């Protein structure tokens, strides 16, 4: 039973017309019911806030003396209905709209100390999560070293070479070997070939499959020797695509050749690091346009079609002067100098190992490294290599001699005046006033320097 009173009792009111709430008289329940059934006296509309009479205390009534009527609390004041804000159509600026109902879009607030989760590339396995090299550049570095080790002359535009490059890149992506392990694997590859009795012929030559298989075995041994996290041969079989029994046979053969001794105190790690940095810088350099070759100056009065055999001896030595008519080095040496390769000496890089040289190899084995003249530029070689730029073939010389004997001699150009000044070079200048007696040129042909 509720302990409340009603504002408007059904039976009583004072002289002013205001309702008076009094407790029901004590009596039987029947009298209370009869009183409750009497019709209320109409007192008119009286607002609830005008009630000034203090309600009696409920403490003296007790549990059973409470009135039968129920007290109803006044209704809560109605709140003013506010229409939800209307968002502007897309494309309108919020500052130009004066509508108070328009609110700017919500801005995500970041609490202090709360940082956005950074998105990072997920690395699935591998030795190193963060590599200290670019996989594409390192793959080219490995490929070129493998070709030098096997004395293989493969073109970089060849489809087979492209597959070899993609195979190395795939293995590096799967295993994520550190650079130290890769350099050790390249060192193992050179040592293994040097230890073979018949060189590359002992293992079947230098086909692209043999180069790829032995390069992968070098990776396997370097990983097992140098890294804390190693892979099983089954994992290497899945990464390289080589059958596991082939990997096992190659590994046993390599270990027998090395006499089970993979540690070498003469491993020149810092030399590999330096060479890789040079290689990377050359890979990142923009391609430089090759200068246009100048036409050789021949007899002006002779209008015959003379065929020249232009035979540059180096891809980067396009403007080497003719022998005995040497031009002083007025240009930067990294553009027009001739590289010199000595077959009887090795650099410090191979002095300890004694079997290979990275940058100072013989001419037949360095078809690739000729594109770095600024690394090993030197004066023109006087050894077994020919650096003449304009050369006649023997057949062309015979044809020209026959034709020249039938035609009258053409007028001879006067030689240019050259001061007899000596330059600090081992060959020096030879005056053009002297009689030209070069075995490869006829008396009416004057070779001039290609550098102006």
Curated annotation (Swiss-Prot):
Signal peptide: none annotated. One of its GO terms (biological process) is regulation of cell cycle. The keyword ATP-binding does not apply. One of its GO terms (cellular component) is cyclin-dependent protein kinase holoenzyme complex. Keywords: Cyclin. It comes from the Eukaryota. GO terms for molecular function: cyclin-dependent protein serine/threonine kinase regulator activity; protein kinase binding. Belongs to the cyclin family. PCL1,2 subfamily. Cyclin partner of the cyclin-dependent kinase (CDK) PHO85. Has a role in cell integrity and polarized cell growth together with the other PCL1/PCL2 cyclin family members. Forms a cyclin-CDK complex with PHO85. This is PHO85 cyclin CLG1. The lineage of its organism: Eukaryota, Fungi, Dikarya, Ascomycota, Saccharomycotina.
């Amino acid at each position: 039973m509720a302990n409340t009173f009603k504002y408007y009792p059904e039976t009583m009111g004072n002289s002013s017309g205001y309702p008076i709430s009094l407790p029901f008289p004590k009596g039987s329940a029947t009298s209370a019911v009869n009183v409750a059934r009497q019709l209320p006296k109409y007192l008119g509309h009286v607002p609830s806030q005008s009630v000034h009479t203090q309600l009696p205390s409920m403490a003296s009534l007790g549990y059973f003396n409470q009135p039968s009527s129920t007290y109803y609390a006044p209704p809560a004041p109605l709140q003013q209905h506010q229409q939800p804000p209307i968002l502007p159509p897309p494309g309108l600026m919020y500052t130009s709209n004066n509508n108070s109902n328009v609110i700017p879009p919500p801005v995500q607030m970041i609490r202090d100390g709360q940082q956005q989760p950074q998105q990072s590339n997920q690395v699935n396995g591998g030795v190193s999560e963060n590599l200290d090299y670019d996989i594409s550049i390192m793959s080219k570095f490995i490929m070129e070293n493998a070709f030098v080790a096997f004395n293989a002359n493969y073109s970089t535009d060849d489809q087979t070479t492209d597959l070899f490059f993609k195979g190395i890149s795939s293995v590096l992506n799967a295993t994520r070997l550190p650079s130290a392990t890769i350099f050790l694997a390249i060192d193992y590859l050179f040592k293994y070939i040097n230890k073979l009795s018949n060189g590359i012929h002992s293992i079947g030559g230098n086909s692209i499959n043999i180069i790829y298989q032995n390069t992968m075995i070098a990776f396997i041994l370097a990983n097992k020797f140098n890294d804390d996290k190693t892979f099983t041969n089954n994992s290497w079989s899945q990464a390289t695509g080589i059958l596991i029994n082939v990997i096992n046979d190659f590994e046993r053969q390599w270990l027998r050749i090395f006499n089970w001794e993979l540690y070498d105190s003469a491993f020149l790690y810092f030399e590999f690091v330096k060479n890789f940095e040079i290689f990377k810088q050359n890979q990142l350099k923009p391609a430089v346009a090759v200068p246009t070759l100048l036409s050789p100056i021949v007899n002006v009065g002779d209008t015959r079609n003379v065929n020249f055999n232009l035979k540059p001896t180096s891809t980067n030595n396009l403007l080497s002067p003719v022998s005995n008519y040497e031009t002083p080095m007025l240009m930067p040496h990294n553009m027009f100098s001739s590289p010199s390769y000595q077959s009887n000496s090795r650099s410090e890089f191979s002095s300890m190992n004694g079997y290979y040289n990275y940058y100072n190899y013989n001419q037949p084995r360095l078809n690739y490294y000729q594109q770095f003249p600024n690394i090993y530029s030197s004066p023109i070689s006087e050894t077994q290599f020919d650096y003449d730029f304009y050369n006649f073939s023997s057949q062309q010389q015979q044809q020209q001699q026959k034709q020249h004997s039938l035609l009258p001699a053409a007028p001879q150009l006067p030689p240019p005046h050259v001061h007899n000044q000596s330059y600090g070079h081992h060959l020096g200048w030879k005056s053009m006033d002297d009689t030209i007696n070069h075995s490869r040129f006829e008396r009416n042909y004057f070779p001039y320097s290609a550098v102006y």
